[in-house]
């Protein structure tokens, strides 16, 4: 029996279904001689994956599926993993296009999906056709997950540190994106940046979905595998996770953008433009510099 330890920190609003899928996968793989063990992180669990992996005594997994992007973006964490990673991005055919181009990160990280964030508003004049850097009083959420952090990083990357500071100073920031959605629904904020799954609740008469001028902000997730597990077993698990059943489920139930070519489903937010931090931004702004600003403006942020 080949043991395989998978760390999972993925789509929290669909987690019950994810867990059911993985329990079934674990049973199927056992029949093939692979003993898959899944450890979950994120909402509903004691800590996020990046918080655990940042600890000096953290046990490294064989496999990772994560939308907690600090695992890959904080060099202090990723350096623990990167030298042992297989070129998993070459293992499965992917759907080519501007969304994939926006989230590629070399050969070691296999893009799985992206959560598109868009405007939800009751006042289209406040946000229609406007850049994220232009909005004052924007509601957004995810202080300790990638939704909030990626927004700040993307604005900093394109418009500068001052724009990121202004966003944090004027924004109405909630613990989670659903909190930002509720602020607009209750009339406490004019516009929120939320996962499109929430914004699709807009009725088109009193509430509306609009896209930022930059395009939807993408929160991607990745699969990666360390050479602590035989490559054949890692490839088998990758193919079983990034499969039509789970990919189609994510599209149909989450309006998510999927990258494996095994699915024919499409998010309603797919288009020609997307907003992500520029790759070179990570080379010029350290994790320490980012968190110095982020933590100073958001006292409840967990600073590694």
Question: Residue locations for each model-derived region?
Answer:
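Early extracytoplasmic/lumenal segment of secretory-pathway proteins
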Residues: 1-74
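Ligand-binding cleft/hinge of the Venus flytrap
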Residues: 24-30, 119-126, 131-174
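Short, hydrophobic alpha-helical packing/hinge segments within bilobed ligand-binding/sensory domains
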Residues: 48-52, 179-183, 234
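Extracellular/periplasmic catalytic domains that process cell-envelope and extracellular macromolecules
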Residues: 57-58, 109-113, 185-186, 216-217, ...
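A structural signal for short loop-to-beta-strand junctions that line the ligand-binding cleft
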Residues: 61-62, 78-117
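Ligand-binding pocket segment of bilobal, Venus flytrap-like solute-binding proteins
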Residues: 71, 154-210
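A bilobed periplasmic-binding-protein/Venus flytrap-type ligand-binding module shared by bacterial periplasmic
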Residues: 117-125, 218-232, 249-253
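Extracellular/periplasmic juxtamembrane helices and adjacent flexible linkers that interface
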Residues: 232, 240-304
């Amino acid at each position: 029996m080949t043991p395989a330890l998978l760390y999972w920190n993925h789509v929290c609003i669909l987690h019950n279904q994810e867990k059911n899928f993985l329990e079934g996968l674990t049973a199927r793989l056992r029949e093939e001689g692979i003993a898959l063990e899944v450890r979950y992180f994120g909402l509903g669990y004691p800590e996020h994956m990046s918080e655990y992996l940042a600890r000096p005594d953290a046990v490294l997994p064989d496999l990772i599926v994560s939308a907690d992007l600090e695992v890959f973006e904080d060099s202090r964490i990723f350096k623990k993993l990167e030298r042992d990673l297989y070129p998993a991005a070459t293992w499965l055919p992917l759907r080519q296009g501007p969304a994939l181009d926006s989230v590629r990160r070399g050969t070691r990280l296999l893009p799985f999906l992206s959560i598109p964030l868009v405007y939800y508003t009751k006042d289209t004049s406040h946000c229609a056709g406007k850049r994220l850097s232009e909005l004052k009083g924007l509601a957004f959420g995810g202080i300790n997950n990638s939704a909030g952090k990626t927004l700040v990083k993307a604005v900093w990357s394109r418009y500068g540190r001052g724009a990121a500071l202004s966003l944090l100073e004027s924004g109405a920031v909630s613990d989670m994106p659903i909190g930002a959605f509720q602020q607009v629904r209750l009339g406490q904020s004019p516009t929120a940046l939320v996962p499109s799954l929430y914004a699709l609740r807009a009725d088109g008469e009193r509430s509306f979905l609009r896209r930022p001028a930059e395009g939807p902000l993408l929160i991607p997730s990745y699969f990666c595998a360390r050479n602590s597990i035989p490559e054949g077993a890692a490839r088998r698990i990758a193919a079983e996770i990034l499969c039509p059943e789970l990919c189609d489920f994510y599209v149909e139930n989450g309006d998510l953008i999927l990258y494996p070519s095994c699915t024919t489903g499409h998010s309603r937010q797919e288009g020609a433009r997307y907003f992500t931090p520029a790759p070179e931004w990570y080379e010029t702004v350290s994790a320490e510099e980012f968190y110095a600003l982020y933590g100073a403006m958001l006292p409840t942020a967990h600073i590694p």
